[in-house]
Design a protein with these regions (language model features):
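Interdomain motor-coupling "hinge/lid" segment immediately C-terminal to the ATP-binding subdomain
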Residues: 2-12, 123, 130-173
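Pre-Walker A adenine-sensing motif
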Residues: 11-29
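Hydrophobic anchor at the beta1->P-loop junction of P-loop NTPases
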Residues: 36
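Walker A (P-loop) phosphate-binding loop of P-loop NTPases
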Residues: 40-41
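Conserved lysine of the Walker
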Residues: 44-45
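Short glycine-rich substrate-engagement loop in P-loop NTPases that contacts/grips substrate
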Residues: 58-87
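Conserved P-loop NTPase "ATPase switch" module shared by AAA+ and STAND
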Residues: 85-102
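Structural recognition of the conserved hydrophobic beta-strand(s) that form the central parallel beta-sheet
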Residues: 117-123
Length: 173
């Protein structure tokens, strides 16, 4: 498990918090089970690592990617249980769809380790939807879209253009 901690610290060290996507402020980060879905390359991994870096205690958090070689030998549930016993409170699992039988293990983590919060990402919607265990009543789900033109301008030009909902635009606000 030490290799997971080492990899996590390295990833965190190389994560910039200069630009944070809009979805960050809309996520209920204190929910017990959070799913962040979106296409490959939209920034899900960066969003997780930025949140940890800005708001979490590193000694109570662990970021893992579900396709790590570690999981060829060890089960996700066993790793989560061991992490919890070491004082872990928040487990971030990236690319969950790459782990076989992921939904059953996440359900078991949720049901059997109530003191552990789980936040996971996934980009293969088909693999996520065919997960065997029903997580719909347990999870809060968010979708991270690709970069909007407004976000692009904010990043490239250093602007701070606000975001408006369709209702606000139609109302002329």
């Amino acid at each position: 498990m030490e290799t997971l901690f080492r990899s996590f610290r390295t990833q965190l060290e190389h994560t910039s918090t200069e630009v944070v996507r809009f979805l960050h402020d809309q996520i209920a980060w204190d929910s017990r089970l959070v799913a962040i879905l979106g296409a490959r390359g939209v920034g899900k991994t960066t969003l997780l690592l930025q949140h940890i870096k800005l708001y979490d205690r590193e000694d109570e958090s662990l970021y893992v990617t579900a396709d790590d070689f570690y999981f060829t030998k060890y089960r996700l549930f066993d790793m989560a249980y061991q992490f919890y016993n070491l004082g872990g409170k928040k487990l971030y699992i990236d690319e969950i769809h790459k782990y076989k039988d992921w939904s059953r293990e996440v359900k078991n983590i949720y049901d059997q380790i109530p003191g552990l919060q789980v936040i996971y990402t996934g980009s293969s919607i088909l693999d996520l939807e065919k997960g065997g265990a029903d997580l719909s009543r347990r999870k809060v789900e968010y979708r991270l879209p690709g970069l909007s033109f407004r976000e692009y301008l904010n990043i490239s030009q250093g602007w701070q253009l606000p975001s408006y909902s369709l209702e606000e635009i139609l109302a002329g606000k």
